[in-house]
């Protein structure tokens, strides 16, 4: 099966062909660290986390880099408001970012370069652009000359004559930089120092880098001049990613990335999420109310390129979906001993028809919703067989087939970054009793009943029931159990 991806650059699906066989260099534009991460950040981070996991599962060696923008006006404004430093603000929200991502099961990138740690590379890149005629100085600032790059607009499909004044895409009524620029489309790659702001020495005097040049330098420094996949939110296509291409390709004469992938935005009840509308939701506020795995399901049930609408109904559906998957994930732990499951799979799960169907779905431009449908199919089948086993003492499907289905479910859930650790799943179900603790209480109940202490037997049965454990007394004095 061939893995195809939708390339924003070419506006079509293409087979994934890497620069180096079996290896992928992948870069994600990260957050500007001036506040807590919100729902939109959650989608971006989880989408590319699952893409990375899937590529690794498909056998690729993935080098994944995600940056932190720690030089920015928003960070400086926050520092002024709090009477602290830009570094202190950045450090605090980087730490908060890692806490949020741990809760969401987002794996750490291989490296998290920061703009402040890449200044030498940034200055080298600006110097190269200046030497090649793509950048010019103006009163301590250095601007990129957009019209000199003939392919400008190739990613976004925009033409200069159709754009509004200013490379940000906004009309500035009184642009303070307008007098410094040779052309209103030009954008800053180095900004002259301002009083009270952090600055660094450079060939153009004290100053700090512009936003777009930071990512160009970090990609080059960490992954090389051309990478396999560049990803980010669709809101970054223009101007940020367009400007990255202009800078990097002007400097090197080589493509910055083979494939450009972008995830869609998040709306809340049909409206764009914003602080002014009062519908701005941080990850940590959301996780006070919602299971992080339900959050992951909500994100994965929509195609990554499409916008997603965050509603109470959608979240409830995702929560119910996670309950269904949890029942399937617990099947082997609840019934595996009774069904004589083996210690390890009898053959590689990649040969399983269910696994092949999952791969066929996801190979089509990371159609995780299609892959999830396979997981739900397995989980519902296991739930049905578990109920039959509890009430009839045997299953309709052979134990060997059920074991393969269960192990396939566990593996594929892991590929999607869902919780598969039994202790965590059990806790999420609502009880913390281990199998051994349950068996011990069942044994105590058995002894009490043998001694005709039925009141104690009923008490133990009720205690287990209150913790989500249902006992079923079978003929011959055998007691089986399952989690509610």
From Swiss-Prot:
It is found in: Cytoplasm. One of its GO terms (molecular function) is ATP binding. The keyword Transferase does not apply. Its main location: cytoplasm. It comes from the Bacteria. Binds 1 zinc ion per subunit. Gene3D superfamilies: Cysteine-tRNA ligase, C-terminal anti-codon recognition domain, HUPs. GO terms for cellular component: cytosol. A motif ('HIGH' region) lies at residues 31-41. Pfam families: CysS_C, DALR_2, tRNA-synt_1e. Keywords: Aminoacyl-tRNA synthetase, ATP-binding, Cytoplasm, Ligase, Metal-binding, Nucleotide-binding, Protein biosynthesis, Zinc. ATP binds at residue 275. NCBIfam families: cysS (TIGR00435). PANTHER family: CYSTEINE--TRNA LIGASE, CYTOPLASMIC (PTHR10890:SF3), CYSTEINYL-TRNA SYNTHETASE (PTHR10890). Belongs to the class-I aminoacyl-tRNA synthetase family. This is Cysteine--tRNA ligase. The lineage of its organism: Bacteria, Bacillati, Cyanobacteriota, Cyanophyceae, Oscillatoriophycideae. The gene is cysS.
């Amino acid at each position: 099966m061939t893995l195809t991806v939708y390339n924003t650059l070419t506006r079509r699906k293409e087979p994934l062909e890497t620069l180096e066989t079996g290896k992928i260099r992948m870069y994600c534009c990260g957050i500007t660290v001036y506040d807590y991460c919100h729902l939109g950040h959650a989608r971006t981070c989880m989408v590319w986390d699952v893409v990375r996991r899937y590529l690794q599962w498909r056998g690729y060696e993935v080098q994944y880099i995600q940056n932190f923008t720690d030089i920015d006006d928003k960070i400086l404004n926050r520092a002024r408001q709090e009477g602290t430093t830009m570094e202190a603000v950045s450090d605090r929200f980087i730490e908060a970012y890692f806490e949020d991502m741990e809760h969401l099961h987002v794996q750490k990138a291989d490296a998290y370069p920061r703009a402040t740690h890449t200044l030498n590379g940034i200055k080298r890149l600006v110097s190269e652009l200046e030497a090649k005629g793509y950048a010019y100085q103006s009163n301590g600032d250095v601007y990129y000359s957009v019209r000199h790059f003939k392919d400008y607009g190739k990613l976004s499909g925009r033409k200069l004559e159709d754009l509004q004044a200013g490379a940000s895409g906004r009309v500035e009524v009184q642009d303070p930089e307008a007098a410094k620029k040779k052309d209103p489309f030009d954008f800053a790659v180095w900004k002259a120092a301002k009083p009270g702001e952090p600055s660094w020495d450079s060939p153009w005097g004290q100053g700090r880098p512009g936003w777009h040049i930071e990512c160009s330098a970090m990609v080059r420094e960490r992954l090389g001049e051309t990478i396999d996949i560049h990803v980010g939110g669709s809101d970054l296509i223009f101007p940020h990613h367009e400007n990255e291409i202009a800078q990097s390709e002007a400097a090197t004469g080589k493509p910055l990335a083979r494939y450009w992938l972008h995830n869609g935005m998040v709306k809340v009840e049909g409206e764009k999420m914003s602080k002014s509308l009062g519908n701005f939701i941080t990850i940590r506020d959301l996780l006070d109310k919602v299971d992080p795995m339900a959050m992951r399901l909500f994100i994965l049930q929509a195609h990554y390129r499409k916008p997603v609408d965050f509603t109470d109904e959608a979240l409830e559906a995702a929560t119910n979906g996670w309950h269904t998957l949890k029942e399937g994930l617990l099947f082997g732990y609840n019934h595996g001993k009774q069904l004589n499951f083996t210690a390890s799979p009898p053959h590689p799960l990649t040969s399983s028809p269910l696994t092949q169907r999952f791969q066929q779905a996801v190979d089509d431009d990371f159609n995780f919703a299609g892959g999830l449908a396979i997981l739900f199919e397995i989980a519902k089948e296991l739930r049905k067989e578990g109920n039959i086993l509890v009430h009839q003492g045997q299953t309709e499907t052979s134990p060997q087939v059920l074991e393969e289905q269960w192990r396939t479910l566990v593996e594929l859930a892991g590929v999607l970054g869902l919780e598969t650790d039994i202790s965590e799943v059990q806790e999420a179900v609502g009880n913390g009793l281990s199998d051994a603790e349950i068996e011990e209480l069942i044994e105590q109940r058995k002894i009490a009943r043998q001694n005709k202490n039925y009141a104690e037997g009923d008490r133990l049965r009720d205690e287990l029931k209150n913790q989500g454990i249902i006992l079923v007394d079978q003929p011959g004095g055998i007691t089986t159990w399952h989690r509610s």
